């Protein structure tokens, strides 16, 4: 994503390296103390005395640090490189003075000039000297953590944050920011919880509210903010849980990201930034919704455009909208994978997790099997080329959450293959299932999430699980089928797949059963139905089999066959399986999508 400011002054590119000390002498800069009205920020009292936040010291080292920070950002802005992307970009969101557009997949931001990196290192050295005599200076500690993170030194940022002796809640916030940047999710959560427990109540309400993520309607925003803070924070936990990118992680990194955005925004509001405007609520909103910029550039409007270049702030890419739909929020136990559209247009928020350079939705299938009063859920996946997961190993997880405050059911498999199924047992209540695969080498993640209902005790047949081949043994089992799960419902015409199901009727040689298997095209035309009725085409019903079932010698329910799928037109086909004998009849179906190999 990229945000750009419009109608800004023309900036002169700087080609030579300025030493910060020289620039400060030449310009006669003095210490700058910006007082910014951050949304919800008040004169917060630090623990132990009456000093207000941000606490600032007046040592010579502190004054030099403030001068150096202001000088660095002036030079930084003047030397920004021109951006060659965004030719077709239009404002996706106009936020005050900011034009925001999503540039996932666009030209990357230009590399930062090398002298800017040197200048930042010089600034860090000045800030480090200041911390040795002013570790209780909230401004200095915040700036040093900020620039350590900008310089890709998160370990140094954490060391600085842990040495902070200023306002208690602010020191915890800086620790949370550094830990979040390091992907230490559990420790970041602990640090931010400590921050929330010690910061002023009205500031805590401001930092945790997510009205900007939910709706652009002002009435909805007012209604959201009108709710009592503690009530709102409690109900928001459901939204954060459903939006958490990976349930297999030890903590909710999206919640940490919200607090990290507020932390970094507070630091940005304390001093100069590359945008040549004062801090304001529009900048705060932009960063709370889409994150803070990690690269900067400038761009002309083109030939004949009289406007001066715009400063462009580039947030991390690719980024995604992890929020569940309003339908899923209202009724999560009826949700489908479509309720988590990662690439939603005109998203109210986006997030680029640092532990994964890309997210995708894999081909998948959930299938259910009875075990007494319980249900075994099979979550099958397949890693396809388009996911760009890279080489093995892969770590897979199936997480089922009843959203009742209890610990979720978690099944993990390290060194997982590219296609398989994980098995988990649930009771009589519905769950939301999250099937997750992470590729550590490729730094990619794939995830699918939808509701799973227990298989009713009255059902006489399980769901259908697609497998790569049939199991010819006399005792097919779910565990064997899971190991060769096809993963997904997209197949090529003219191929053979396996199917596994379980028959819960009392089938014996004395009371044999019959299994009917057929596939019917969804939305077939009149001509296709007519030619199929005359047996001239298999386009409407490519599969039709009747199997005699005398039961298994051991009485087990598992069944498996190989299913030949003829070459048929692309489209959706409903695969239906019917089991019956003298004691009863039942059926199950699953949707198959046939793709053209060409």
Annotate each PLM feature:
Residues 28-39:
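Bacterial N-terminal signal peptides
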Residues 53-96, 100-103, 329-598:
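Intrinsically disordered, low-complexity terminal regions enriched in Ser/Thr/Pro/Gly
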Residues 73-76, 80, 111-125, 146-158:
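Helix-turn-helix repeat elements of alpha-solenoid scaffolds
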Residues 225-357:
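A cross-family detector of function-defining hotspots
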